[in-house]
């Protein structure tokens, strides 16, 4: 089980990234606009750098919704590999069957 503080910290990062998504994307689009002069684009890059670091969506980690484990995460189910195995063995995941040949 992951530490609760790390799970809460990651939730805060996701919330901040969600709140500042539009502003960050607007500044990024202005920075990538080739019609603007290089000097102005450097100033826009400085503006992008002044945004909070945790407002970037790349800084949040995918975590298991049950245990909070950050590694071995399956996006399709939203859980870690360990919980996937447990729930699949119990038959709690629809459409998941144990393979045999």
Curated annotation (Swiss-Prot):
InterPro entries the UniProt entry points to: Ribosomal_uS14, Ribosomal_uS14_bac/plastid, Ribosomal_uS14_CS
Family matches, as Gene3D superfamilies: 1.10.287.1480
Subunit structure: Part of the 30S ribosomal subunit. Contacts proteins S3 and S10.
GO biological processes: translation
Keyword Ribonucleoprotein (UniProt): yes
UniProt record similarity statement: Belongs to the universal ribosomal protein uS14 family.
Keywords: Ribonucleoprotein, Ribosomal protein, RNA-binding, rRNA-binding
UniProt source species: Neorickettsia sennetsu (strain ATCC VR-367 / Miyayama) (Ehrlichia sennetsu)
Lineage: superkingdom: Bacteria
Molecular function as annotated in GO: rRNA binding; structural constituent of ribosome
Protein name as it appears in the record: Small ribosomal subunit protein uS14
Function, as annotated: Binds 16S rRNA, required for the assembly of 30S particles and may also be responsible for determining the conformation of the 16S rRNA at the A site.
Any GO CC annotation of this UniProt entry: small ribosomal subunit
């Amino acid at each position: 089980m992951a530490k609760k503080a790390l799970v809460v910290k990651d939730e805060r990062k996701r919330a901040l990234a969600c709140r500042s998504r539009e502003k960050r994307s607007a500044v990024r689009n202005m920075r990538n606009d080739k019609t603007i002069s290089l000097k102005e684009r450097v100033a826009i890059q400085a503006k992008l750098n002044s945004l909070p670091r945790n407002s970037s969506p790349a800084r949040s980690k995918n975590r298991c919704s049950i245990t909070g484990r950050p590694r071995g995460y399956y996006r399709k189910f939203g859980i870690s590999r360990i919980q996937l195995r447990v729930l699949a063995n119990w038959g709690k995941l629809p459409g998941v069957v144990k393979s045999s040949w």
